[in-house]
Amino acid sequence: MRTEYCGQLRLSHVGQQVTLCGWVNRRRDLGSLIFIDMRDREGIVQVFFDPDRADALKLASELRNEFCIQVTGTVRARDAKNVNADMATGEIEVLASSLTIINRADSLPLDANHVNTEEARLKYRYLDLRRPEMAQRLKTRAKITSLVRRFMDDHGFLDIETPMLTKATPEGARDYLVPSRVHKGKFYALPQSPQLFKQLLMMSGFDRYYQIVKCFRDEDLRADRQPEFTQIDVEISFMTALQVREVMEALVRHLWLEVKGVDLGDFPVMTFAEAERRYGSDKPDLRNPMELVDVADLLKSVEFAVFAGPANDPKGRVAALRVPGGAQLSRKQIDDYGNFVKIYGAKGLAYIKVNERAKGLDGINSPVAKFLTADIVDAILERTGAQDGDMIFFGADNKKVVADALGALRLKLGKDLSLTDEDKWAPLWVIDFPMFEDDGEGGLTAMHHPFTAPRDMTASELKTAPEEAVANAYDMVINGYEVGGGSVRIHNGEMQQTVFGILGINEQEQREKFGFLLDALKYGTPPHAGLAFGLDRLTMLLTGTDNIRDVIAFPKTTAAACLMTEAPSFANQAALTELGIQVVKKAENN
């Protein structure tokens, strides 16, 4: 039906007869001439109808936005004065000789000339996806997956599928459960990741595995989370953590070079402890120049309990955040930032405005100045590198609250004051995470997952001091987004059972949930490691959007619903009966 795509026509096509298929993007009726912008997935081209082709001109008068049409015509060069430099096809146009209206369009629920609500866009997603910017994002996503497959094939990886219907395992989020009709009362789980299957593939001798795979997590959603998402999943045998990072870094550098024309260079490496200390986050955005600076040692003797208390507490921390040019902030803005940090557990936000540094105590403005000596102020200004016109904010509390509050404030200030370089790419690796963290109930939980190996510890050493264990894990971070994470896996049965025990999984539960894994570990398991990238998040970064729903063809809302198909929906009673399921309605409060 077509010979060319609209958006691919260029000066090289001048004089050729072409047949195009697509949609009316815009129509302009000048009486004796009718112009339309005709659109398909590749872009837009201008088509015009003149009186010499009367039948086509008459039919063109009926055209409206989003009519699906076929046009045959001749490509012509535009006059120099009519060239549109903003269009890829702006040097040419098509003189139509025939027009077929394939399908007409009703009055549109989406307005191409206005900003539509996300609710409307998701409800009429098939119309939303016709927009050039949406089509371009999905084309970029397709290019990324193609580049990944070629790279992995070139590096000896095998694309192997793993099951979608599997067994529930504890991986940090709730599972989506699928009832079995054959095995009444039993349920499959949709995989949160192919973690155990890819480890079993290593045990099976397939030493380089990858898969672009759907995963499912029943968790609370954010702008960059979906209940079903796509991973670039990788596992490798007989490689160290460093070697795995080198291969995966090469993949990401390849993607950025091919998609953006940007050489990311070598990725810096930072420990978890350093990232938390300097940036208040384990996924620091290095485009932002501000850093947290420890000042507790300078404030231990001040007569101000808000500072002195945490400064003298081994579990406490007092840190400063210097904001270049921040002295311009108004009292209201400072109060707003004080309320902002309370979201993260902080009780308030002390500050020093640096007016004239050379004047020391007399050159600052601060509600806590009366508690500080000139020497302490000078030391704080020196350590933070403060200059005239800067602002210094303080966090004083337990270590987690200070990191969370000042880390979030750092990001917000970077955006609000345009301190973050939006034109820069800042990748890094974060390594050496704690293996376990407090679950809030007196126990421990795995910071990554229970199949991550510790660094340089035996099973007996781990059992003795689990709080001191460092995971042989690594996250790739780009511009403050964790785009991928992985680890060296446990390949020893004793170590795996030790980790399960630390996590409170008794031997009976270990056999019930992981018996197949523990058995497999008995038969010559190779050392192996892996990583998984979030394809959705990578695409989000490479297309310049901050909403993950913009890079998924048919995403869910933040309430995990599809507005277009109205999923989830109630099941047919006959189907429920066959599955042995009874839906219990929640009692309404009187």
UniProtKB/Swiss-Prot annotation:
Residues 195-198 are annotated as: Aspartate. It is an enzyme of class 6 (ligase). GO terms for biological process: aspartyl-tRNA aminoacylation. It is found in: Cytoplasm. InterPro entries: Aa-tRNA-synt_II, aa-tRNA-synth_II, aa-tRNA-synth_II/BPL/LPL, Asp-tRNA-ligase_1, Asp-tRNA-ligase_1_N, Asp/Asn-tRNA-synth_IIb, AspRS_core, GAD-like_sf. GO terms for molecular function: aspartate-tRNA ligase activity; ATP binding; nucleic acid binding. It catalyses: tRNA(Asp) + L-aspartate + ATP = L-aspartyl-tRNA(Asp) + AMP + diphosphate. PROSITE patterns: AA_TRNA_LIGASE_II. Pfam families: GAD (PF02938), tRNA-synt_2 (PF00152), tRNA_anti-codon (PF01336). SUPFAM superfamilies: Class II aaRS and biotin synthetases (SSF55681), GAD domain-like (SSF55261), Nucleic acid-binding proteins (SSF50249). ATP binds at residues 217-219, 226, 482, 534-537. One of its GO terms (cellular component) is cytoplasm. Keywords: Aminoacyl-tRNA synthetase, ATP-binding, Cytoplasm, Ligase, Nucleotide-binding, Protein biosynthesis. It comes from the Bacteria. L-aspartate binds at residues 171, 217, 448, 489. Its EC number is 6.1.1.12. NCBIfam families: aspS_bact, PRK00476.1. Belongs to the class-II aminoacyl-tRNA synthetase family. Type 1 subfamily. Homodimer. Catalyzes the attachment of L-aspartate to tRNA(Asp) in a two-step reaction: L-aspartate is first activated by ATP to form Asp-AMP and then transferred to the acceptor end of tRNA(Asp). This is Aspartate--tRNA ligase. It comes from Salmonella choleraesuis (strain SC-B67).
